[in-house]
Every structure is written in structure tokens, then in C-alpha cells.
Amino acid sequence: MTPHNEAKKGDIAKVVLMPGDPLRAKFIAETFLEDAVCFNTVRGMLGYTGLYNGKRVSVMGSGMGMPSMGIYSYELYHCYDVEAIIRIGTAGGIADGVELRDLVLAMGACTDSNFAHQYRLPGTFAPTASFELLEKAVQTAREKNLRYRVGNVVTSDIFYGDCENETAEWKKMGVLAVEMETAALYMTAARAGKQALSITTVSDLPLKGESTSSEERQKTFTQMMEVALTVASEAVDGYDK
């Protein structure tokens, strides 16, 4: 147990899906998992473990932003022996050709945060996905004939920014989308020697003023969920050996 998670050792699977919204975790458990059991309700950050395609998988909310993702992912890696975390969430598409409901598989994560300062590195760290998980996700998206993009995202500490041009500047660097958690997950995984992947669905196009509804974000972005669950169920075998 930790201050934020009432689960006991063994309650959580080796691979965990992490949506930002704990209600999305509940939806995934009730919709996709067999024999799902709730292992955490502390602070309303719901977590469940069940079976997907006969493989043991967990899903737990991360909350919004890098500090929250940093706390929950750190505890999962260090206190519960989790080997891989797959973030599933929403992002604002900013690159040309990225459309609403497209999947974005984050190969790397830029950030405006000083999250990496804690590591006292003598230079700049480039947070990246675990290639094995990314490769599985790309293969799954292709097999399902889904619209997806692979590339950089930018993880921002700021949702309501004071500078209107920042998103456009990231676009110039080929960044696909903006969100708020991936860089923290990738850095936490790297420091722990574990694996991580971020799969997001484009819920907004901030440079065009287009968006989806909050209800749709919670309950209908099932393509992302199914890709992540497939990757998780296939990855479990490698960690259970």
C-alpha cells in the first residue's frame, strides 16, 4: 500500500493501462475485462485488474498533468512491480493532416516542464517510448486498419496558456499533438528501467477550434482502448517468464 493506492502486492498486473480519467478506467474494466476486481478507490483514482483475451491486465487512472502521472506511475513501477504502463488518453492535434479521432502513438515527448531537473542530468534528456510496445501498437493499428500517426508529442504543464503562439511553434518542429502526461511517464519509466508507451486519441484541433464532447472522450474512444489492450495482453507473456 502507498498513500495513494490501497492495493496489496499481487493485486496489480505486470502491465497497466493508464487513462487520465478514472471513470474511463471504470468504463474499460466494465466493457472489456472479464472478472474485473477494483483494487483502488483512494482519492477516487479507480483501479481494476481483470482478464483480456485470457491475460491478466490492469487499468488505473493517472489524473491530469505530469505531477499526478509521476506519482502514480512511480508507485506502480517501484511499489507494485509493474513492468509496463500504457497511457491512453486524449490530445490536441496540431500537425497538418492530423484529424479528430486519429490515434497518435508517441515515439517521443517534448515538454515545457522542468520535470527532468530532479535527475540532475548534465544535459537534456529525450523521453522516448519503449520500442517493443510501440512496434506492437503500430502492428495492431495496421491490422485493424485504423488512422494513426507515429511521432513526437509535446507534454505541457499548462492547459490555459497566456501565450497564443506556443502551439504553433511546436507545430513548426513537426510535433503531432499536445497533451499533459506522456513526458512524465516516459521519464519515470526510464529512471525505473521499465517500459512505457503513450497512445492518445485526438479530441481537439486547437489551431482550428474543433473538438469532441466530454462524454465522447469518456466512453467512445474505443479504438485506442482496444489497441492498448491488445498490446498489453501480448506483452504480458514476456514479463511473466
Regions inferred by a protein language model and the residue ranges of each:
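Flexible, glycine/charged-enriched surface loops at secondary-structure junctions
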Residues: 34-41, 145-151, 236-241
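Generic non-transmembrane alpha-helical segments
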Residues: 136-144, 188, 227-238
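Metabolite-binding pocket within alpha/beta catalytic cores that recognizes anionic/polar moieties
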Residues: 1-127, 131-135
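Glycine-rich beta-alpha junction loops
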Residues: 22, 92, 109, 154-158, ...
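Active-site rim beta-loop-alpha module in soluble metabolic enzymes
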Residues: 124-173
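Generic structural signal for well-ordered, non-membrane alpha-helical segments
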Residues: 18, 25, 65-69, 126, ...
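His/Asp/Glu-rich mid-to-C-terminal helical/loop segments that flank catalytic regions of hydrolases
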Residues: 206-241
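A C-terminal functional module that forms or caps the active site or interfaces directly
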Residues: 164-205
